[in-house]
Amino acid sequence: MKQYLELMNKVLHEGAQKDDRTGTGTLSIFGHQMRFNLQEGFPLVTTKRCHLRSIIHELLWFLKGDTNVAYLHENNVTIWDEWADENGDLGPVYGKQWRSWATPDGRHIDQLETVLNQLKNDPDSRRIIVSAWNVGELDKMALAPCHAFFQFYVANGKLSCQLYQRSCDVFLGLPFNIASYALLVHMMAQQCDLEPGDFVWTGGDTHLYSNHLEQARLQLTREPRPLPKLVIKRKPESLFDYRFEDFEIEGYDPHPAIKAPVAI
């Protein structure tokens, strides 16, 4: 994960001081890209321990089309609690947009099902895209989508994915985002009888919060360790039938966790 540390170092040394929605303040750069070859290992940050349970359950929650934190709570995941209302609802966030995008004529589009069909039947299409950035529903969302738009690409029997993330919390959020989309690529590839290719991450406002700077400097003193390997133990009937116990990470030997506050 040298690319991740290089990005963190760049933000620390080149970032502009900016105010932000949370009132915390950031060091920020605009426009950055990283590429991860998924054949070389699963891109889970090793210079601090990442909570893999939360990453997997959050992705399964998205895939269910769910927008209430009840499922997450059932699985001891609290990463969305700060934004949920008193009933646990978040409004039409990622799961709703991925699985049930509302059209003006009253229909609902399952973008993931559409993408799966494209990958299987028209893999050379340049329109294999999922968007969570629904302008008409942004004001109903507890948090506007940060990882907003992703595209799949098939070549030489391998499935690659590029994500555009309009806003990126480099210290806390980005390790989750990289691992989550890498996991999704592995799952989609398995369902389409392809091999995982590259995950390409493209960031817009890419920032370190002012109360994460010391933690970032500590992390930069640590030497990256070998990437772990993802094992998917079975091939379910569909993308939407995976369970938490289907996934195993082999050889994950990270440095200790580094705590930092979430900017809300």
From Swiss-Prot:
GO terms for biological process: dTMP biosynthetic process; dTTP biosynthetic process; methylation. Keywords: Cytoplasm, Methyltransferase, Nucleotide biosynthesis, Transferase. It is found in: Cytoplasm. DUMP binds at residues 21, 126-127, 166-169, 177, 207-209. It holds the Pfam family Thymidylat_synt. It catalyses: dUMP + (6R)-5,10-methylene-5,6,7,8-tetrahydrofolate = 7,8-dihydrofolate + dTMP. The keyword Transferase applies. One of its GO terms (cellular component) is cytosol. The active site is at 146 (nucleophile). Pathway: Pyrimidine metabolism; dTTP biosynthesis. Its EC number is 2.1.1.45. (6R)-5,10-methylene-5,6,7,8-tetrahydrofolate binds at residues 51, 169, 263. Homodimer. Belongs to the thymidylate synthase family. Bacterial-type ThyA subfamily. Catalyzes the reductive methylation of 2'-deoxyuridine-5'-monophosphate (dUMP) to 2'-deoxythymidine-5'-monophosphate (dTMP) while utilizing 5,10-methylenetetrahydrofolate (mTHF) as the methyl donor and reductant in the reaction, yielding dihydrofolate (DHF) as a by-product. This enzymatic reaction provides an intracellular de novo source of dTMP, an essential precursor for DNA biosynthesis. This is Thymidylate synthase. It comes from Cronobacter sakazakii (strain ATCC BAA-894) (Enterobacter sakazakii).
